[in-house]
Amino acid sequence: MDSNHSAPAIVITVINDCASLWHEVLLGIEEEGIPFLLQHHPAGDIVDSAWQAARSSPLLVGIACDRHSLVVHYKNLPASAPLFTLMHHQDSQAQRNTGNNAARLVKGIPFRDLHA
């Protein structure tokens, strides 16, 4: 088993200490009642980091973010094919809905429209 975290949580890899830029995404995950675990890395490819986070998450969902973009990945997808990619300039509602959708993937319920 690839998972190395015992508590069920979405694993979020934060590259270059940028978690505060993506606060709305974290709030979206919290709104859905799913825990998350932040792990900090000084550098890395965002898509690969998200896939590695998904592989290490007991919930099979991983996120990686840097100062420019955020990627949501699922362990059962190909490494090069993330589920969602969000750019930092997108509005706070799109960020919140992306967090909701990452959590909804765990729950197995329909996604929200990113721009609704």
Swiss-Prot record:
UniProt-annotated location(s): Bacterial microcompartment
Annotated organism of origin: Salmonella typhimurium (strain LT2 / SGSC1412 / ATCC 700720)
S-S pairs: none
Entry GO CC: propanediol degradation polyhedral organelle
Name of the protein described by the UniProt record: Propanediol dehydratase-reactivating factor small subunit
Recorded catalytic activity of this chain's protein: ATP + H2O = ADP + phosphate + H(+)
Miscellaneous section: Bacterial microcompartments (BMC) 100-200 nm in cross section are formed during aerobic growth on minimal 1,2-PD-B12 or anaerobic growth on 1,2-PD-tetrathionate medium, but not during aerobic growth on glucose, anerobic growth on glucose or pyruvate-tetrathionate. BMCs can constitute up to 10% of total cell protein.
Assembly with partners or alone: Forms a heterotetramer PduG(2)/PduH(2).
Cofactor field: Mg(2+)
Primary localization class, coarse: other
Keywords: Bacterial microcompartment, Chaperone, Hydrolase, Magnesium, Metal-binding
GO molecular function: hydrolase activity; metal ion binding
GO BP, sorted A to Z: propanediol catabolic process
Residues that bind Mg(2+): E31
Similarity-based family: Belongs to the DdrB/PduH family.
InterPro entries registered for this protein in UniProt: B12-dep_deHydtase_bsu, Dehydtase/Dehydtase_re, Diol/glycerol_deHydtase_re_ssu
SUPFAM superfamilies recorded: B12-dependent dehydatase associated subunit (SSF52968)
Function: Small subunit of the propanediol dehydratase-reactivating factor (DDR), which reactivates suicidally inhibited adenosylcobalamin-dependent propanediol dehydratase (diol dehydratase, DDH) found in the bacterial microcompartment (BMC) dedicated to 1,2-propanediol (1,2-PD) degradation. Reactivates inactivated DDH in the presence of ATP, Mg(2+) and free adenosylcobalamin (AdoCbl), by mediating the exchange of the tightly bound damaged cofactor AdoCbl for a free intact one. The 1,2-PD-specific bacterial microcompartment (BMC) concentrates low levels of 1,2-PD catabolic enzymes, concentrates volatile reaction intermediates thus enhancing pathway flux and keeps the level of toxic, mutagenic propionaldehyde low.
UniProt cross-references to Pfam families, sorted A to Z: Dehydratase_MU
Pathway assigned to this chain's UniProt record: Polyol metabolism; 1,2-propanediol degradation
